[in-house]
């Protein structure tokens, strides 16, 4: 039994250790809305077992469920999977979303935190029931609905995610946070309460709750992608269907993005050449997340401006 169930090694040391390790890893994400009565006990159990199997990444636990983005050594993948399936009766059918690209650089540390909610939605209305969700749809239905002019697609991701990749003609709810989006989407889409609406996000957790929120606010025909963009791509590949998502999929780890189509729909902020390459400004007091092509990374030393470059 570990005395302190948290990481005690610096990120710099952990990064060096991971880069020196040659073992293959698989990057996955999963979530499940279900009641967790003792979040502290469940959080510690997750940490102990993930630590044992050298799992890295980010896990949020709350009384409404679990949300995780993690990197697992390939040799331990089925051990971790079986542990999760047996950690609670509600997880015996847990869907684990495999990333489109696996890289050992995705995460350097393991962080398992207790949160008020597994996704910060800002919803305080006690009458809201997040279990009354929209209708799940998979790739075949998605592709059919994309060609229907009477169907509205809504992207429930942040603006910087939308910028490098999205479905054709999908509406962007401009925001930097999910809780801000939920407020805006009701106002912006007020005219469409009787129209078919398809909501999507990266892995499903945000669009699932957003679909319930739309229902709660009087929208009648709400659909959402089963397991998000990742689930759509996997299902389309499995069934030999065309992938209609354009651009790259933003991911919340050190990879920054996963390429889905060859089409680049975004541009370098400094030279305006096509690029989908996100970086954080190299000047620590800035650390701005922005799109920068490889040429400008060299020219500006991975900084967002000449000012930041001069103050390195």
Curated annotation (Swiss-Prot):
Q: Where is the signal peptide?
A: none
CDD domains recorded: RHOD_YceA
For this UniProt record, the keywords arranged alphabetically read as follows: Oxidoreductase, tRNA processing
Single GO molecular function: oxidoreductase activity, acting on paired donors, with incorporation or reduction of molecular oxygen
Residues annotated as the enzyme's active site = 201 (cysteine persulfide intermediate)
Query: Do you know which InterPro entries this protein is assigned to?
Result: Rhodanese-like_dom (IPR001763), Rhodanese-like_dom_sf (IPR036873), Rhodanese_C (IPR022111), TrhO (IPR020936), TRHO_N (IPR040503)
Rhodanese domain ranges (all copies): 147-237
PROSITE patterns in the cross-refs: RHODANESE_3 (PS50206)
Question: Would the keyword Oxidoreductase turn up in this protein's UniProt record?
Answer: yes
What EC numbers are recorded for this enzyme? Answer: 1.14.-.-
Catalytic activity of the protein: uridine(34) in tRNA + AH2 + O2 = 5-hydroxyuridine(34) in tRNA + A + H2O
Does the record bear Oxidoreductase in its keywords?
yes
Choose any GO biological process term that the UniProt entry carries and state it: tRNA modification
Task: Spell out the Gene3D superfamilies in the cross-references.
Answer: 3.30.70.100, Rhodanese-like domain (3.40.250.10)
Q: Which family does it belong to?
A: Belongs to the TrhO family.
Q: What does this protein do?
A: Catalyzes oxygen-dependent 5-hydroxyuridine (ho5U) modification at position 34 in tRNAs.
What this protein is called in its record is tRNA uridine(34) hydroxylase
Q: Report the source organism.
A: Buchnera aphidicola subsp. Schizaphis graminum (strain Sg)
Cite the source lineage. Answer: Bacteria, Pseudomonadati, Pseudomonadota, Gammaproteobacteria, Enterobacterales
């Amino acid at each position: 039994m570990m005395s302190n169930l948290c990481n005690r090694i610096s990120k710099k040391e952990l990064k060096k250790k991971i880069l020196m390790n040659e073992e293959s890893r698989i990057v996955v994400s999963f979530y499940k809305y279900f009641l967790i009565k003792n979040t502290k006990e469940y959080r510690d159990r997750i940490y102990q077992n993930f630590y044992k199997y050298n799992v890295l990444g980010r896990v949020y636990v709350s009384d409404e469920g679990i949300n995780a983005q993690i990197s697992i050594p390939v040799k331990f993948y089925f051990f971790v999977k079986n542990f999760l399936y047996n950690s609670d009766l509600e997880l015996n059918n847990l869907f684990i979303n495999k990333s489109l690209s696996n890289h050992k650089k995705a995460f350097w540390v393991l962080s398992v935190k207790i949160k008020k909610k597994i996704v910060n939605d800002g919803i305080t209305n006690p009458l809201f029931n997040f279990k009354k969700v929209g209708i799940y749809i998979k790739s075949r239905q998605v592709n059919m609905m994309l060609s229907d002019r009477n169907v509205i697609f809504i992207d429930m991701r942040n603006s910087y995610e939308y910028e490098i990749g999205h479905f054709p003609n999908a509406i962007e709810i401009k925001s930097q946070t999910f809780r801000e989006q939920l407020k805006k989407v009701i106002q912006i889409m007020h005219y469409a309460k009787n129209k078919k609406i398809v909501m999507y996000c990266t892995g499903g957790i945000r669009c699932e709750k957003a679909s319930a929120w739309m229902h709660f606010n009087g929208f009648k025909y709400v659909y959402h992608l089963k397991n998000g963009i990742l689930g759509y791509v996997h299902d389309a590949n499995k069934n030999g269907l065309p992938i209609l998502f354009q651009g790259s999929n933003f991911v919340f780890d050190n990879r920054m993005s996963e390429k889905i189509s060859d089409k680049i729909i975004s541009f370098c902020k400094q030279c305006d050449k096509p690029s989908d390459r996100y970086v954080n400004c190299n000047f620590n007091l800035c650390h701005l997340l922005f799109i920068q092509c490889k040429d400008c990374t060299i020219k500006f030393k991975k900084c967002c401006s000449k000012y930041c470059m001069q103050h390195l």
